[in-house]
A protein has these predicted regions:
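Pyridoxal 5′-phosphate
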Residues: 1-258
Length: 258
C-alpha cells in the first residue's frame, strides 16, 4: 500500500515527475491519486498515472483526479488488443513534441522546418487502427450499460469472498492487505513456485497469472520470487473462487502439503 506520507518522503528538489499506478496489479491496492496529485502540483511536479488496471475497475473523473497524464490499455476493458488511450492535459499535449512521425500528423514540411497538426492528430501518425478503435467504442458502451458502480460492487463482493476463502487454506499466503482494494488477489503457496501453481490450475480450467506481473521490484521487496494472481471481472462468480480453492488443494496434494 502506498500512502501520501510515503510519497512526500520520496520527493526531493530534483523530482520532476511522479509516475505511479492507480491500482496495483499485485496487491490490488487503490492508490490515492487525487491527494498525490495535489501534493505534486504544490511542488510543481507532473503526475503520470498508469491506469491500465484502474480504468476497468474504478469510476474515473479526470477533472477530480487532476493528474497530468493517464494511460489506459483497452484490452483490460474488454476491448481489443494492440490499442491504448493516453489522456493528457491540453497544455502538456500542446507543449510536448510528437514521439513518432508519419502521415496525418504534420501540417507543413519544408526543407528546413516542419510544423505539426492540431491535437490529437499531432500524436496519431500513420493509418489508425480503425477496427480496434471501433471495437473499443463498443467496449465502453458495454461497460456503461452495466454501470461502473455495479462492476465495482460485484468485484468487491467477489474479492472479499475469495480472501476469506483462501485465508482458511493452510500454506496459502495472500500478498498485501490494503484498506482499499480492487479486483486483484495475489497469493503464494509455501514450497510451490507460482509457475507450477498456474500449470496445475490450468489443467483444471482455472486461469490465473503467474510471475512478476510487471512488478519485479515489488516482488524483490516482498522477498518472493513471483506470485500467483487471480483477477476478477464482471463475468466471474463465487463458484469460480470455489473451483480455484479446490484446484489449490489439488496442487498442495501433489506437493505433499497439508
Amino acid at each position: 500500500e502506498i500512502t501520501l506520507e510515503e510519497i512526500e518522503k520520496k520527493i526531493t528538489p530534483k523530482t520532476k515527475i511522479i509516475s505511479i499506478t492507480h491500482l496495483s496489479n499485485v496487491t490490488g491496492a487503490i492508490i490515492p491519486i487525487k491527494e498525490i496529485t495535489q501534493l505534486a502540483h504544490s511542488k510543481g511536479i507532473v503526475v503520470v498515472v498508469d491506469g491500465c488496471q484502474g480504468a476497468p475497475h474504478l469510476k474515473l473523473d479526470m477533472q477530480n483526479l487532476d493528474c497530468d497524464f493517464y494511460a489506459i490499455s483497452c484490452h483490460k476493458m474488454y476491448g481489443p488488443t494492440g490499442l491504448g488511450v493516453l489522456y493528457g492535459k491540453k497544455k502538456w499535449l500542446e507543449e510536448l513534441p510528437p514521439y513518432q512521425g508519419g502521415g496525418g500528423m504534420i501540417n507543413e514540411v519544408k526543407k528546413d522546418r516542419i510544423s505539426y497538426g492540431d491535437l490529437p492528430n499531432k500524436y496519431e501518425a500513420g493509418t489508425m487502427a480503425t477496427a480496434q478503435v471501433i471495437a473499443f467504442d463498443q467496449s465502453i458502451k458495454f461497460l456503461e450499460s452495466i454501470g461502473i458502480e455495479n462492476v465495482m460492487k460485484h468485484e468487491a463482493e467477489l474479492i472479499e469472498y475469495g480472501q476469506e476463502l483462501l485465508k482458511k487454506n493452510n500454506s496459502v499466503k495472500l500478498i498485501g492487505n490494503p484498506k482499499k482494494k480492487g479486483g486483484v488477489l495475489s497469493f503464494t503457496i509455501e514450497g510451490v513456485h507460482p509457475h507450477d501453481i498456474a500449470t496445475i490450475l490450468d489443467e483444471d480450467g482455472v486461469a490465473i497469472r503467474a510471475g512478476h506481473h510487471c512488478c519485479q521490484i515489488l516482488h524483490e521487496k516482498l522477498n518472493i520470487p513471483a506470485s500467483a494472481r487471480a483477477s476478477v471481472g464482471i463475468y466471474n462468480t463465487k463458484e469460480d473462487f470455489d473451483k480455484l480453492n479446490a484446484s489449490i488443494n489439488k496442487c498442495k496434494k501433489i506437493f505433499n502439503l497439508k
